[in-house]
């Protein structure tokens, strides 16, 4: 598994912030800028993947007919996972 795929969300986000700072700075060559941009895209995809994994695991516990029932949480602005 590539190193970036093992990163936690927080670590990937931190690396992404560093990439953005580097791109906003001065003195990068075109080639370096492209490399940072590509790394940033990979990190964004990884962060989205991690968020999607967590979103799929979030559940709301409801009490229906005396039984505890779970269903997936529907987040505003995101995909609806509710039943």
Swiss-Prot record:
It is found in: Cytoplasm. GO terms for cellular component: cytosol; exodeoxyribonuclease VII complex. Keywords: Cytoplasm, Exonuclease, Hydrolase, Nuclease. It holds the Pfam family Exonuc_VII_S. It catalyses: Exonucleolytic cleavage in either 5'- to 3'- or 3'- to 5'-direction to yield nucleoside 5'-phosphates. GO terms for biological process: DNA catabolic process. Belongs to the XseB family. NCBIfam families: xseB. Heterooligomer composed of large and small subunits. This is Exodeoxyribonuclease 7 small subunit.
């Amino acid at each position: 598994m590539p190193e970036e795929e093992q990163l936690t969300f927080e670590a990937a986000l931190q690396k992404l912030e560093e990439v953005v700072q580097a791109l906003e700075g001065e003195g990068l060559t075109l080639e370096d800028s492209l490399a940072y941009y590509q790394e940033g895209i990979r990190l964004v995809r990884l962060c989205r993947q991690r968020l999607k994994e967590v979103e799929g695991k979030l559940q709301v516990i409801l009490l229906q007919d005396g039984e505890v029932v779970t269903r997936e949480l529907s987040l505003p602005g995101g995909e609806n996972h509710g039943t």
